[in-house]
């Protein structure tokens, strides 16, 4: 098998492989690569494929960026997805391919002065959803284990079951809001999104954070993600009001979805029914649009390693009846002294 840089391969063949691969999800695609380039500085796309007789045998997305003045292999702080290999490789061929892949990852990372790489096995890939990945494959590649879990809702269940599996308080919030018609939720996709609507979410997001969070390139990149059919924007307002109180972004691929970001206007942050209603209406929309799984959020350990805000968000996302799936992660350092500064 031979290594072919992404620049010599092109997007069409790469994405066609991802579309067919059980081991690829959106984060493997060129759509997400383009999006990722808006989330860092001094971006270099180091992605490559393995080729054999003119056939793609694996795709390896990898990007090096400057974050906080430090060079890292990352996508805007998101870990790099584990390589996606062709399904028909024999066990021996898989080992050979992975040996070649991880050697090349290390070479490229060092060549571009990356201090570290963080990688994960995407929970929305078919092998994880089907419970075929039982151990962290990164450990045998010299990565330090940083695995956690994630919550993934099975949308093939009927609505009554989805509601019943939620924490009782969230369920009561949703039922009460539906009965009184308290809120109106709108969902915007590639066909209905407009710049004006998206700008309203960006303003809402900045108000929630208390500062401008997104750069202009990232704002445009996020809008482009929706326009490419890889995202949804969900916005909530009180019935009879014109302004939005909350919203969130969902990433889409292969009839599976991931909750990317959320924001609530600070004045309504303690209205606990808002988040519950917004998630429920998102789940209903996805279910009726034929989506099978919705990864609602990573479940972080309740330790001081994470901020109070991060732990609170993680706890909130655990309340919606999702199946707990492994989130196999790992990190590897190429320059320990610089990495410790991060």
Where are these regions (language model features)?
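A conserved beta-strand-loop-helix scaffold within acyl/acetyltransferase catalytic domains
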Residues: 3-53, 57-69, 123-148, 153-268
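Aromatic (often tryptophan-rich) hydrophobic motifs at membrane interfaces
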Residues: 49, 99-103, 224, 230-338
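Short, solvent-exposed turn/loop segments enriched in Gly/Ser/Thr/Pro and often Arg
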Residues: 63, 120-125, 329-335
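Conserved acetyl-CoA binding element of GNAT-fold acetyltransferases
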Residues: 70-89, 255-267, 297
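A gly/proline- and charged-residue-enriched helix-loop-helix capping module
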Residues: 76-128
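Soluble or luminal CAZymes and related metallo-dependent hydrolases
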Residues: 93-101, 169, 214-218, 274, ...
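C-terminal "cap" of GNAT-fold acetyltransferases
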Residues: 153-157, 333-342
């Amino acid at each position: 098998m031979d290594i072919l840089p992404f620049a010599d391969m092109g997007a069409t063949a790469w994405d066609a492989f991802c579309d067919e691969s059980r081991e690829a999800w959106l984060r493997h695609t060129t759509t997400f690569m383009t999006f990722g380039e808006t989330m860092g500085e001094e971006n270099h796309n180091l992605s490559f494929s393995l080729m054999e007789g003119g056939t793609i045998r694996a795709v390896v997305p990898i990007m090096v960026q400057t974050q906080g003045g430090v060079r890292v292999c990352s996508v805007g702080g998101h870990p790099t997805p584990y390589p996606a290999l062709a399904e028909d490789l024999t066990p021996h061929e898989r080992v050979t391919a992975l040996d070649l892949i991880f050697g090349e990852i290390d070479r490229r990372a060092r060549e571009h002065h990356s201090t570290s790489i963080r990688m994960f096995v995407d929970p929305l890939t078919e092998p994880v959803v089907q419970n075929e990945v039982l151990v962290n494959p990164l450990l045998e590649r010299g990565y330090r284990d940083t695995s956690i879990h994630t919550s993934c809702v099975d949308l093939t269940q009927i609505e009554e079951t989805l509601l019943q599996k939620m924490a009782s308080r969230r369920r009561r919030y949703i039922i009460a809001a539906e009965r009184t018609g308290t809120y109106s939720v709108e969902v915007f996709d590639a066909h209905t999104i407009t710049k004006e609507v998206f700008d309203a979410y960006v303003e809402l997001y900045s108000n929630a954070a208390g500062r401008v969070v997104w750069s202009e390139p990232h704002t445009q990149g996020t809008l482009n993600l929706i326009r490419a059919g890889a995202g949804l924007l969900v916005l909530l307002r009180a019935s009879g009001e014109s302004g939005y109180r909350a919203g969130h972004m969902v990433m889409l691929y292969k009839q599976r979805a991931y909750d990317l970001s959320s924001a609530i206007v600070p004045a309504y942050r303690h209205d606990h029914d808002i988040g519950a209603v917004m998630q429920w209406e998102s789940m209903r929309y996805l279910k009726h649009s034929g989506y099978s799984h919705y990864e609602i959020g990573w479940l972080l350990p309740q330790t001081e390693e994470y901020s109070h805000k991060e732990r609170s968000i993680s706890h909130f996302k655990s309340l919606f009846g999702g199946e707990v799936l492994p989130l196999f992660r790992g990190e590897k350092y190429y320059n320990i002294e610089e990495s410790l500064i991060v």
